[in-house]
Swiss-Prot record:
It comes from Metarhizium robertsii (strain ARSEF 23 / ATCC MYA-3075) (Metarhizium anisopliae (strain ARSEF 23)). Its EC number is 3.4.14.5. Residues 36-62 have a biased composition (Basic and acidic residues). The gene is DAPB. The active site is at S760, D837, H870. It is a single-pass type II membrane protein. This is Probable dipeptidyl-aminopeptidase B.
Amino acid sequence: MAPPFTDDPESQRPSTSRLSQDSLSSVSTTSLVFDRIQEEMDRDPSASRSARRDLLPATKDEGDFDENASETGAFLGPPGVPLQRQPMDRGFRRILIIIGAVFVGAWLAGLGIFVLSGSYKHESDSEHDPDANSRGSGKAVTMDQVFGGFWSARSHSISWIADPDGGDGLLLEVNTANGYLVVEDVRADKESTDTNAGQTADTQPAKPRVLMRDPYFMYHGEIKRPDWNEPSPDLKKVLLAVKREKNWRHSFQATYFILDVETAQVQPLVPDNVNAKVQLANWSPTSDAISFTMDNNIYIRRLNQANDVVQITKDGGPEYFYGIPDWVYEEEVFAGRSATWWSDDGKYLAFLRTNETAVPEYAIEYYIQRPSGKKPAVGEEAYPEIRKIKYPKPGAHNPVVDVQYYDVSKGDVFSISAPDEFPDHDRIISNVLWAGNKVLLKQSNRIGDFLKVILVDPSQREAKIVNSINIAEIDGGWFEISHTMTYIPADPSKGRQQDGYVDTVIHEGYEHIGYFTPIDNPKPIMLTSGSWEVEDAPSAVDLNNNLVYFVATKESSIQRHVYSVKLDGTNLTPLTNTSSEGYYTVSFSSRSGFALLSYKGPKIPYQKVISTPSIPIQFSRTIEDNADLADKAKKHELPILKYGTLQLPNGISVNYLERRPPHFNPKKKYPILFQQYSGPKSQTVTKKFAVDFQSYVASSLGYLVVTIDPRGTGFLGRQHRVVVRSQLGVLEAQDHIAAAKHYSSLPYVDPSRLAIWGWSYGGFQTLKTLEVDAGDTFSYGMAVAPVTDWRFYDSIYTERYMRLPQDNTAGYDASAVRNATALGMNKRFLIMHGSADDNVHFQNSLKLLDYLDLAGIENYDVHVFPDSDHSIAFHGANRMVYDRLNNWLVNAFNGEWLKIADPKPIDTKKRRHVS
């Protein structure tokens, strides 16, 4: 189950300030000193009492004179008494001089420390410090800021593109000063300060190539504006998509055109149907053909002959898909819209065939919009539009998939099966990778705990299983789907005697990188090892230098750094500064000589392009510093962040993030909002910078916001996550409750005001935690788009963690949210759902509401968003979700929901009537 948004849930980062003062000129040194005295008093109660005695004026009796009055002083007598001058004793004078000198010296020393420490600065002049223990004066974070993009860090994605001439460092830029589509060298002068050492005439930046001058083109007198583009590998043509229409999370259909770069002429991809709705189009590696899927059939457009279109399949339609995934494979397997793979030489095309004949349909009703674009028949305007999706649920028929091959020269389509591969009803194909003139396939059983790697030879039409991994026997868990398996061709001159591949493998309880060579060797050379994990590895492979680049948690489970390692497992080297905390992502150029390094936190995010150890030159250019975001962080009161590891009963350790209000006072009693996602292998507690809804709650509402990553979540080793198998939500609920009990015991927490919330899996976990807790610890909960019974979610995701319901009835029952009586023991909870959610069906919430009705439980609120899908965004609904969360939470912590638990009419006899 993917989260509702592309950016995984992010953690928070702080800033500075107290009042809305922006410069030192508006703040006196005296006020700053008193601010710091107050902070010290808050931290040390004993010092606080003595400091207050020193700061408060003494109580004066009537008739006492004021020693501090301007008219009199400490050495002056009472009013009316004449002054008498007397000579001062010489010894006493010497003592006074010494005391004065000591005082002046101490004052000067203190002033020096004050200046050198920067304490004289107003908080809004200080750099953002994510580890600060207190906040000064500044502006509060607002909801409008959070949802208006005010706190969004600017970031740039680089579309790296292979150089047909064999170079490196080329990227595709859109809407530049030179043209709409321009191929640039990443080293091209951008009027910035660079480190650009070691360049020679052979390593000078390539000149820009303009592929498309204007952001539109003309076809038969009509202006067309592209929504999507893909240059051919030889950069001589560009595939353009117009009138793009969204389908599911990743997929869309559009009308496609082919632009000739040299002549600027365009032609339709489908010559005899200019307005054809094409679902997918891909260039061949040789630039002389384009494969595309239309009406679920796959075609090839050959460009060396005019109007030459070859239809490869003919039975595509509602039941059969070719070259594109169906709903469940798009969502849960490929995480994308393509299921087509060209061989490197362009001689073969591999594609997925999906047979959905036996897959049950799920109907989604649209009450407001008509996604089909079709007008209803006359007299049927008042009926909702119904869209039926082939949606397999646990235990139901899955789509039957296999890989087919098209021989371009012979024009025939064929399939190749390996002995002992999984049968049709029990097969998931998760990876297809061309390895030279062969293909590597990954197949698993439908519950995802047995993996087979198959090597296919299309030219010989043979296949064999080269590796079988019984994950159930290794740790009782499941196979994690990834798409980073990388082919390593043989090159004896580089020490690689035979073909192989690099992939993520389970090694001693953690996910690491293994190098399999020869390609049919089931025993890898381990490139990494230890009590840490790699993420989506490898990120890139430099074949010239036998280097593998990857991102890992080697420094900390909540950080990410970038490393390289040799193919023999030696010389593991960081590319990022591991002496400082950091959360990095990275993308590499086609030959791995350059990398876009994106620093996500904990400080202000930035991006820079760097050279890698793969090339002899040194290059570094910052392309985004988010200086404006840094300035905003200085001037606003962001939460105080506390990271750590929480020790729960039975030796369980979980990462936590506690967000405190900017002016946190340990002597106060704070309510807590627990925010979580909790899904398998997810991670919410990270060192990323973020100012989001949780930041707003802590900064502006003044509540504590706590997140933990319970058992089942990622990057703490396999044993931390696979224990949840067959009983999703149960152990996670225990961890959330244990964490809440720990916080309830702290002196600064109000144990009567604890709430929990989440979206999607987080919505499920919210309700499951409230059910297990039954009001003992948590009082309130807010669940958005929740699963309530895993029998209602899709089969591929659910069965991976829960197995088949026919084999695990007790586990499905234990995971389902169905104990309405237990939910009724909480003070109140909120459920929100979109009626057109194609991912977590509205059926989930309706089933729970029926349980509540049957039990007579009424301590909840429901908000349904018409025609919204899983993101709940139709007709401005997304902001309404958070407004409702905000208002509902404030009412909860203010005790308003307690007033309506047993409402009574107002006694009309006691009302005052005004005539």
